[in-house]
Amino acid sequence: MALTKAELTDLLFENIGLNKREAKEIVECFYEEMRAALQNGDGVKLSGFGNFQLRTKPQRPGRNPKTGEEIPISARRVVTFHASQKLKSMVEANYRGESGTN
């Protein structure tokens, strides 16, 4: 199960005591700032969590699976995420049944 924006908003409401409108605005602002940074070609670094970066993929040959015809796949930019070592350690500790708190 994935954590959604609506669930994140509810968690801010429940745990911090913000009203629902304020919690929703904070979540939306956070997402918008991340989107804007990535659209401008900047990376997003969240300490202890990970990094979002843009990677440029060059044009490459592809193949239509139905016809077998070779077609070009356009160059594009993709967003990549690299988890921090701290996040990786916490996930691994949770998987092994350890406390995961460092």
UniProtKB/Swiss-Prot annotation:
NCBIfam families: himA (TIGR00987), PRK00285.1 (NF001401). One of its GO terms (cellular component) is cytosol. Keywords: DNA recombination, DNA-binding, Transcription, Transcription regulation, Translation regulation. Signal peptide: none annotated. It comes from the Bacteria. GO terms for biological process: DNA recombination; positive regulation of metabolic process; regulation of DNA-templated transcription; regulation of translation. This is Integration host factor subunit alpha. GO terms for molecular function: DNA binding; structural constituent of chromatin. Disulfide bonds: none annotated. Residues 49-70 are annotated as: Disordered. The keyword Transcription applies. CDD domains: IHF_A. The gene is ihfA. SMART domains: BHL. Heterodimer of an alpha and a beta chain. It holds the Pfam family Bac_DNA_binding. This protein is one of the two subunits of integration host factor, a specific DNA-binding protein that functions in genetic recombination as well as in transcriptional and translational control. The keyword 4Fe-4S does not apply. Belongs to the bacterial histone-like protein family.
